[in-house]
Amino acid sequence: MQILPIVISLITILFLIASILFFSKIKLGIIQIDTFWIVTMIGAIVLIVCRCVSIQDLKESFFSRTSVNPIKILVLFLSLSSLSIYLDELGMFSHLATFFANRFSKNQYVLFFGFYAMISLLTIFTSNDIIILTFTPFLCVFCKENRINPLPYLMMEFVAANTWSSILIIGNPTNIYLSSFYNLDFMTYFMSMAIPTISASITGLLILFLIFHKSLKEPLQHKYEKENKIKKIPLVFGLLHLVGCTVLLSVSSYLNLPMWLIAMAFSLSLMLFVILYSAAEKENQIVPLLKRLPWNLIPFVLSMFVLVLALKNSGLTQILSQTFESWDQVITFGYSGLLCANLINNIPMAVLYSSLLEHASLKAVYASILASNIAAYITPIGALAGIMFMNLTEKHDVKISFVTFVKYGLLIGLPSATAGFLALRFLP
């Protein structure tokens, strides 16, 4: 077993954790840059320079014609993100939130469970990151204006978005990444993950209610909010693209079309519509849309892929894989996935586990996917969504400390994950 690639990878991961906790952004004039991808990119470059990964290895991995090509996976994720971000740019999600709050604010119980249902439904067909970015500011402002405790609603939002994101392949980049490695089609994935996701979600909701039911008893005097108007033509086109893409993805295996190609086609079609509509209306809708795409995931995922290649070449992943496969695979990969994601973040965890799962059972793959989603609400390190969530709450003067987040995360996350793993373990 080679030691150098393990040492370099370990140092990179330690600096990654430090960057997430202590210096998540750096300022260059008026521009703020995330540091997480810079750290991993430096680590990847060092590994290449030290010849822990050969150029031939990179060519074979990045330009392979299989579905495990990381570039194809990134195209799939960015394309799907563009469809959701466009609807958010139009104001659809904030409109729905305001509409719901104005009509169902009779008491906090109705509001709490109603928001949970809406956030869960929207997460299933869009993306957990988009929901977090949209609903966190809304809930902070809503709770402040109505003088109610924001913590139950914010924790509910985060738990709902990061549990229901497991049910469809499009809900999280980790779902896309791991399922692509094992050629799982849309419907096969859904049929296998539906019951574990529902089990985890029901468990999480019950625990949320037990923790916060006293706070929800407080009276609510809702202040009516004006609902923003949405232009109908862009909204219709945006929804048609999202629904059409989701439907075609669900039957992609029968059409013998790769999912990344379907998503890219819908994304390019939407971009063309936005450009033409913007020109006709003398507006600029394309630039805000392009700015909000998570471009920093490209160097991050590719760099982590280099780290995993180096660890694979060192022989470490083979040793770990053989060790994990000798035990109960659902439990081993599930709980180790939770721990790993909260040490190095869920995207690097997914990249690492793609190597560990090479000879594992399909249930182990699904357990790893479920872990990569639920890990997000155990600690803020577990996912990029956690970092965004903490930054957004701080900007809106809602204080949720790291310790508070972890306390509720462990209380809710571990039982939810256990329910999901057990459902997966005993399913035929």
Language model segments and positions:
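Membrane-core helix-loop-helix motifs of multi-pass transport proteins
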Residues: 1, 146-214, 219-230, 236, ...
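Hydrophobic transmembrane alpha-helices of multi-pass small-molecule transporters
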Residues: 1-85, 195-201, 205-313, 408-428
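Cytoplasmic-side transmembrane-helix entry/capping segments in multi-pass membrane proteins
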Residues: 31-41, 98-102, 107-109, 114, ...
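Membrane-embedded alpha-helical segments and adjacent helix-loop junctions characteristic
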Residues: 57-146, 296-360
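Helix-loop-helix module between adjacent transmembrane segments
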Residues: 80-88, 107, 118-128, 159-168, ...
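Re-entrant/interfacial helical elements at transmembrane boundaries that shape
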Residues: 96, 130-141, 154, 168-182, ...
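Alpha-helical transmembrane segments of multi-pass membrane proteins
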Residues: 108-120, 147-164, 328-339, 359-380, ...
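Residue-level recognition of transmembrane alpha-helices
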Residues: 116, 137, 158, 171, ...
